[in-house]
Amino acid sequence: PAVVDQLADALAPHTVLVHHDFTQQADFPLKAPNVRFVPNPVRTGWAVFGFVEGIFLTLRHALAELDFDYLQLLSPSCLPIKPMAQFEAHAMGSALAHFDCIDLLADHDALMSVGYRAF
């Protein structure tokens, strides 16, 4: 819970919608005031299709219940490396596309960190 609270604090004042499978960890208190739990979460875990169902349930709940311009799926390890105000200014800027990329084959640190997701 502490890592999710840390992520929510970093993203404040924006709403952080959390899908948590309480059968995996029943005691999961979050203190950040901007956290909302997805109601009736599905069972998740490795080799369980519920992980995908949990993502879709979260997206459906967000679309039905929240008012937002941008939505990003995150895990607790996705802590921002720059202030939210800087990201907000960039996203609201005049650029037509908000996309950045890293040449994984040229950046060995990036290749070791996230390369398995690409190959």
Describe the role of every protein-language-model region.
Residues 1-119:
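ER/Golgi luminal nucleotide-sugar-dependent glycosyltransferases, focusing on the catalytic module
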